[in-house]
């Protein structure tokens, strides 16, 4: 699956206006494409899609994410797409680590999975594996950054995001061994 993303720097108020217009998700049901909004999960939004076919596939997912933390906080994380119809929260897609201090524009052309129109389809987009070199980064990152798309009447609980607060000294300790290993492999080639 091809995933394109870019990170740009704009004033927060401009980004907020853009984002409130709504992140879009194009869903293919049978032979028809239908565009539905993705809203923050704290709105508990449920989207109704005309179920004319047997399976639903996700296509052309476009998400804009405004920075919710200062760039100086150094917070990064991976954007996950999960099916939370059961407790395992099956991973459908995961991006590389992204800087949450900048705007993120994410485009996913096609997701390699489909779900039956007869079943519940609670799909959640959210940041996980959050990393910050400062303890303050954890305090700053207090706003929910999850979006929910669902075809279910039931309520589902979202899996908790795990924080990795890494101090500068620990980060250096982690980096040093990997550099030594890389130099050894380079010299042997």
Swiss-Prot record:
Name this protein carries in UniProt: Movement protein p22
Any coiled-coil regions, as ranges: none
A GO term for molecular function: RNA binding
Pfam families in alphabetical order: TBSV_P22
Lineage start: Viruses, Riboviria, Orthornavirae, Kitrinoviricota, Tolucaviricetes
Provenance organism: Tomato bushy stunt virus (strain Ja9) (TBSV)
GO cellular component entries: host cell membrane; membrane; viral capsid
Role according to the record: Cell-to-cell movement. Displays RNA-binding activity.
Family: Belongs to the tombusvirus/aureusvirus movement protein p22 family.
GO biological process, one term: transport of virus in host, cell to cell
Principal location class: host cell
Highest taxon of source: Viruses
Self-association and partners: Interacts with host protein HFI22.
Cellular location(s): Host membrane
């Amino acid at each position: 699956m091809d995933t394109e993303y870019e990170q740009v720097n704009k004033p927060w108020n401009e980004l907020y206006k853009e984002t409130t217009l709504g992140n879009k998700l194009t869903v293919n049901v049978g032979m028809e494409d239908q565009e539905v909004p993705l809203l923050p999960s704290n709105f508990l939004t449920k989207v109704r899609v005309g179920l004319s076919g047997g399976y639903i596939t996700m296509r052309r997912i476009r998400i804009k994410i405004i920075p919710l933390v200062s760039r100086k906080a150094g917070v990064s994380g991976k954007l996950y797409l999960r099916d939370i119809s059961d407790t395992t929260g099956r991973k459908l897609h995961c991006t590389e680590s992204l800087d949450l201090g900048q705007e993120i524009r994410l485009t996913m052309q096609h997701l390699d999975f489909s779900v039956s129109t007869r079943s519940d389809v609670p799909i959640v987009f959210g940041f996980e594996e959050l990393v910050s070199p400062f303890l303050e980064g954890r305090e700053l990152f207090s706003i929910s950054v999850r979006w929910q798309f669902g075809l279910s009447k039931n309520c589902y609980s979202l899996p908790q995001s795990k924080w990795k607060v890494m101090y500068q000294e620990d980060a250096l300790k982690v980096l040093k061994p990997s550099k030594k290993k890389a130099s050894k492999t380079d010299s042997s080639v």
